A protein has these predicted regions:
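Short loop segments at secondary-structure junctions
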Residues: 1-3, 12, 76-80, 98-99, ...
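N-terminal strand-loop-strand
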Residues: 1-23
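Short secondary-structure boundary/hinge segments and terminal tails
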Residues: 17, 61, 122-123
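Unchanged
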Residues: 26-117
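Charged phosphate-binding loop/patch that engages nucleotide di/tri-phosphates or the phosphate backbone
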Residues: 118-130
């Protein structure tokens, strides 16, 4: 994949009873760093590994009553590699051009708050690098 494309996955979202587009995500296993977990989840969900992973920041959902953090990373220099995952069905990988992010953020089937926030942050981070 190229630096102008983000890989999305389409999966069934039981909470809203429909298929949703979103970013690759998953939990950090014991002993893993955020970078290692991101690389593993990318292999499981999208069929790619990353030679380079940049950690941008941690996000919290409701810091006044939850301690959960999500780590926002940008994976680059991808290569094909698949690991078996724990999803009940195979996920569809949907490449999306970064120049079309505004259109993506308005789609009804792209509604997960973490993914929306992550794209805003990543877009600004990428702008600063160019």
């Amino acid at each position: 994949q190229d630096d102008d494309t983000v890989l999305l996955v389409r999966e069934y979202a039981a909470g809203v009873h429909r298929y949703e587009l979103g970013l690759v995500k998953g939990r950090i296993d014991a002993g893993e760093t955020p970078e290692q977990a991101a690389d593993r989840e990318l292999k499981e969900e999208a069929g790619f590994g990353a030679r380079r992973i940049d950690v941008l920041r941690a996000l919290t959902l409701a810091p006044t009553y939850m301690s959960h953090q999500s780590w926002l990373v940008v994976a680059r220099d991808l290569y094909p590699e698949r690991l078996p995952g724990d999803e009940p069905e195979e996920l569809e990988v949907v490449p999306w051009k970064l120049q079309d992010l505004d259109r993506l953020m308005l789609r009804e089937d792209f509604s997960e708050g973490r993914s929306l926030a992550a794209l805003f942050i990543a877009r600004e981070w990428l702008k600063e690098r160019t």
